[in-house]
Amino acid sequence: MDRLHIIGAGLAGSEAAWQAAQAGVPVVLHEMRPRVGTFAHRSGDFAEMVCSNSFRSDDDERNAVGLLHWEMRAAGGLIMATADRHALPAGGALAVDREAFSGAVTAALRAHPLISVAEEEITELPAEGHWIIATGPLTSGALAESIRAVTGAESLAFFDAIAPIVHAETTDIRCLRQSRYDKGETEEERTAYINCPMTRDQYEAFIDALLAAEKTEFHAGETAGYFDGCLPIEVMAERGRETLRHGPMKPVGLTNAHDPATKAYAVVQLRRDNALGTLYNIVGFQTKMKYGAQTAVFKMIPGLEQASFARLGGIHRNTFLNSPTLLDDQMRLRARPNLRFAGQVTGVEGYVESAAMGLLAGRMAAAGILGRSLPPPGPETAMGALVNHITGGAVAKTFQPMNVNFGLFPPLDDARGGRRGRKDRYKGYTDRAKEVFTAWLAAQA
């Protein structure tokens, strides 16, 4: 039987190896640590949690990441089973003892009879064989260059230029829908943007808050240089109080239907971020403000006072593919179908999301080697919604890493509005997802 080779023993690679081996496929897991280290990792253990010890909410009834936990447990995931065994008290969240967790994952993989570990750095994309690349945001320079050569110069990013993403349903009716200069051939195109106009006083107060907000510093190993194309908004504001008004907040080409005679002093634009139209990103608002400061400052924008954020902004090093243009729904590189990608390098963000994509990639690769066909789970599920987002549901031109959230799910037919309705709707999402995911697993039995 052919072997499956996996590059990277992070959360995605570890889960992919486990799933494939459990399906009966021999696996070679290639990991460069501890021989070649990174500035972030502290050990040679697998599935090392670098940034925090939290897998976030464990509520599988009304939280999208909790639902993802449920799906991974249902699928026999190694990462979730190990996390449960090494869980710490954390309220409604799932947090783990990091060292015990990664040590246990390492022990389980090394003990599996179908998994062999090769402690070596892979510097080029292999031309033959079955491979999963799960090298994460700190992909080594040599391999990153090989990926860039195969996928194209614009396909691999080395810094996130992350703008905040808002749940569209939480924007206020005062916000107006219009493309700048009414550009577009269809009504949908001409109303593609949500616009939030500001008076001069509102703009000045916003700039004051932006300049005073607490910012994060670059981590060790990150360059402090910025690309002009993705300057943080606070850096732009530091260059002059009017800079933003002549940049992403310029008020030209837009009219206020509520008050046509009054011109806005500045305008914040939100652009659709997914095909469903449930998520919008704040255009040009990449930032390194701390999360608490972001929420306070961005809620000063007229119409966003009650906004719910699917993701807050940030700029930090992250190697990821423009997956919607490169990967098929089997997570294979279209140009080289023997190569699958999994984890954070595909453009998902978060420990759980990365491991979930590893779970899918491992199962899909094993099915292919065994001569079977395995479609992804439906987009009604958390895993299916994520893989759909990274392989076609997202807008390729503005693609950025994404956490799982209900904005990625197809809407429910009988959803109600309001706070109480939102809780019922989330429960509706999870009930539907569990039914669809259970059927997907049963079809593989």
UniProtKB/Swiss-Prot annotation:
It is an enzyme of class 2 (transferase). It is found in: Cytoplasm. Signal peptide: none annotated. Its cofactor is FAD. Pfam families: GIDA. The keyword Flavoprotein applies. GO terms for molecular function: flavin adenine dinucleotide binding; tRNA (uracil(54)-C5)-methyltransferase activity, 5,10-methylenetetrahydrofolate-dependent. Coiled coil: none annotated. GO terms for biological process: tRNA methylation; tRNA wobble uridine modification. One of its GO terms (cellular component) is cytosol. FAD binds at residues 8-13. Its EC number is 2.1.1.74. It catalyses: uridine(54) in tRNA + (6R)-5,10-methylene-5,6,7,8-tetrahydrofolate + NADH + H(+) = 5-methyluridine(54) in tRNA + (6S)-5,6,7,8-tetrahydrofolate + NAD(+); uridine(54) in tRNA + (6R)-5,10-methylene-5,6,7,8-tetrahydrofolate + NADPH + H(+) = 5-methyluridine(54) in tRNA + (6S)-5,6,7,8-tetrahydrofolate + NADP(+). InterPro entries: FAD/NAD-bd_sf, MnmG-rel, MnmG-rel_CS, MnmG_N, TrmFO. Belongs to the MnmG family. TrmFO subfamily. Catalyzes the folate-dependent formation of 5-methyl-uridine at position 54 (M-5-U54) in all tRNAs. HAMAP family: TrmFO. NCBIfam families: gid_trmFO (TIGR00137), PRK05335.1 (NF003739). This is Methylenetetrahydrofolate--tRNA-(uracil-5-)-methyltransferase TrmFO. It comes from Rhodobacter capsulatus (strain ATCC BAA-309 / NBRC 16581 / SB1003).
